[in-house]
């Protein structure tokens, strides 16, 4: 084990940490050995200098080692965003998750309450009637029986309680905003991850590659959204067959029209729940289109679709047949049983 004081001293000089040094430091923080001052110093020094791929990889490896695991099928996917994009948008990845599940791909969705918006994944699911504070075996049963399960981050990452107060006091973004979406308790190997800043698209794809993901898209909308956006291009780093390639996608490539940012504005959890249900009930809207677009990308990652356009067609079938809505009803029933 590396001495935490010496690691903080190294970071203070601007020098990057090795993967092992980062893992040692984050193990100290998450096991409760580090003092609040040490945690604050390390987190802010990393933030100011800029976290490296190796540092994030080391930190995620510790998060994963300490999390409470969920059993999920080998081909399960996660659709998750970092949050913190400040958009106050509708719950895109949550809605997309039901479309993907409706298309027959098991979904092990990881999420939390709102970070910067008025409604995070946990908030909107609770408003829809889903029981979110489940034990790992109960979530596993949801994935098996309903085709989709929700892992409420605080319930699966108990070690985070040791860093929570420091994060609240710092009141600014830290490396932990990046770690959560990369630390899926079901250990999924197929991920669609939205990030709050363009600068993190390629690095997080590299982290996922380092940690054994089979296929992933890391995305950031040109309008700042931590999803694939409907207002213009989206930056993508795709991990495929052990290689990372970067490109841009647009709604038009998937056969969808552009919309203004106002079309994606959300409200509180209750309002967003009504909006999500209306999409699952087949109502046309920009929300339906952006959810279809993100579901299409997840279907590409899962190997179910070859192109975004094909993924949108599969997603439309899942919505129009009622299959996606049925997944929500089933999840509500299983999670509360």
From Swiss-Prot:
Swiss-Prot/TrEMBL GO biological process terms: L-tryptophan biosynthetic process
Record keywords: Amino-acid biosynthesis, Aromatic amino acid biosynthesis, Glycosyltransferase, Magnesium, Metal-binding, Transferase, Tryptophan biosynthesis
Top enzyme category: transferase
Record GO terms (molecular function): anthranilate phosphoribosyltransferase activity; magnesium ion binding
Binding-site residues, 5-phospho-alpha-D-ribose 1-diphosphate: 81, 84-85, 89, 91-94, 109-117, 121
EC code(s) of this entry: 2.4.2.18
Catalytic activities: N-(5-phospho-beta-D-ribosyl)anthranilate + diphosphate = 5-phospho-alpha-D-ribose 1-diphosphate + anthranilate
SUPFAM superfamilies: Nucleoside phosphorylase/phosphoribosyltransferase catalytic domain, Nucleoside phosphorylase/phosphoribosyltransferase N-terminal domain
Cofactor info, note text: Binds 2 magnesium ions per monomer.
Associated pathway: Amino-acid biosynthesis; L-tryptophan biosynthesis; L-tryptophan from chorismate: step 2/5
Residues involved in Mg(2+) 1 binding: 93, 227
Chain segments annotated as coiled-coil in the UniProt record: none
Family under the similarity heading: Belongs to the anthranilate phosphoribosyltransferase family.
Functional description taken from the UniProt entry: Catalyzes the transfer of the phosphoribosyl group of 5-phosphorylribose-1-pyrophosphate (PRPP) to anthranilate to yield N-(5'-phosphoribosyl)-anthranilate (PRA).
Known partners and oligomeric status: Homodimer.
Name of the protein described by the UniProt record: Anthranilate phosphoribosyltransferase
Annotated source species: Bradyrhizobium sp. (strain BTAi1 / ATCC BAA-1182)
The encoding gene: trpD
């Amino acid at each position: 084990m590396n001495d935490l004081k010496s690691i903080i001293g190294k970071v203070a000089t601007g020098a990057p940490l090795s993967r092992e040094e980062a893992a040692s430091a984050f193990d100290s923080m998450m096991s409760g050995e580090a003092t609040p001052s040490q945690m604050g110093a390390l987190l802010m020094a990393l933030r100011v200098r800029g976290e490296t791929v190796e540092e994030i990889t080391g930190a995620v490896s510790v998060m994963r080692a300490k999390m409470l695991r969920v059993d999920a099928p080998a081909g399960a996917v996660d659709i998750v965003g970092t949050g913190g994009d400040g958009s106050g948008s509708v719950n895109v990845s949550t809605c997309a998750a039901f479309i993907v599940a409706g298309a027959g791909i098991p979904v092990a969705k990881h999420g939390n309450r709102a970070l910067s918006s008025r409604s995070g994944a946990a908030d909107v699911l609770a408003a829809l009637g889903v029981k979110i504070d489940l034990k790992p075996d109960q979530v596993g049963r949801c994935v098996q029986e309903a085709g989709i399960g929700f892992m409420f981050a605080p319930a699966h990452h108990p070690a985070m309680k040791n860093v929570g107060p420091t994060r609240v006091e710092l009141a600014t973004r830290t490396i932990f905003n990046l770690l959560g979406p990369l630390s899926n308790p079901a250990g999924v190997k197929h991920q669609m991850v939205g990030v709050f800043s363009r600068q993190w698209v390629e690095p997080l794809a590299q982290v996922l590659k380092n940690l054994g993901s089979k296929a992933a898209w890391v995305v950031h909308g040109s309008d700042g959204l931590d999803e694939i956006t409907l207002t213009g291009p989206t930056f993508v780093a795709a991990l495929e067959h052990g290689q990372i390639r970067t490109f841009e996608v647009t709604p038009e490539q998937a056969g969808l029209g552009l919309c203004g940012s106002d079309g994606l504005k959300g409200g509180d959890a209750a309002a967003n729940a009504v909006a999500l249900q209306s999409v699952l009930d087949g109502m046309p809207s920009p929300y339906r289109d952006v959810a279809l677009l993100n579901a299409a990308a997840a279907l590409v990652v899962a190997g179910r679709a070859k192109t975004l356009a094909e993924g949108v067609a599969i997603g439309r079938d899942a919505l129009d047949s009622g299959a996606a809505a049925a997944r929500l009803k089933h999840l509500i029933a299983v999670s509360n049983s």
